[in-house]
Amino acid sequence: DGVALAIYNIEKRGQSVVIGDQTGIGKGRQAAAMIRYGLLSGYLPIFFTDRYTLFSDMYRDCKALGIKEARPLVVNAGVSVVDFDHVVEQKATCTSDEIWSPADEEDNEKYEAERMALYQKQYEVVYKAPKKSVLQDILIKGELPQDAFDYLMITYSQLKDAKRDMTRLNFLMALCGQHRVLFIFDEAHKSSGVNAGKASVITQGINMILEETPQTQCVFLSA
């Protein structure tokens, strides 16, 4: 029902929708369904979430819905997407780029990095972020390499430095000008926040994109 209502709001009303089911009810599967809908309907889906280790959970849901071949651009440098159904033998530590996060990232960053390293060793890596230099080139150019990626995976933390470095925000803005974009905001409450009466940098950045590109569609998911 949540997916049907989201699609109805997009196609008939041009409006966003909030899917607010409780934890464990299946918001991830609904988010994957919206990625699938976007791919089949000519949108460029952009999946935002709170933690980059959740990219692998989203891949699991996409796989269950028959779109495991859809190729994500992982915007978080050094991060991999793994297949939990394929355990591999222990091997040497992955030589991926160091995982980048803004300087003011929360204390759980160390835990996330350790979990990602464990994922990379224990499970088959199906997708990973491009090398840092390649990724930076994509971001600066503000366009996706032709026929290389089908959707994006990114965390809210990538916009925390937007006041100092507009590269990622400008990249997203450019994509919204070039494509019909469908944002899927997982853990949407994590993107909001008010400090000293002002909206967070993340919220301001997302609002700026939506104001400048009114044709962009959104789905918000939050328990």
Show which residues each predicted segment covers.
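Conserved pre-motif I regulatory segment
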Residues: 1-20
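Active-site signature of alpha/beta-hydrolase-fold catalytic machinery across serine-
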Residues: 4, 33, 37
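Conserved ATPase "switch" residues in P-loop NTPase domains
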Residues: 10, 39, 210-213
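Walker A/P-loop
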Residues: 14-34
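Hydrophobic "anchor" residues on beta-strands that sit immediately upstream
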Residues: 16-18, 151, 182-183, 218
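An acidic- and aromatic-residue-enriched active-site/binding cleft used to recognize and process polar
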Residues: 22, 28, 50-52, 188, ...
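Conserved helicase ATPase motor motifs in RecA-like P-loop NTPase domains
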Residues: 24, 189, 210-223
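SF2 helicase/translocase NTPase motor core
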Residues: 39-208
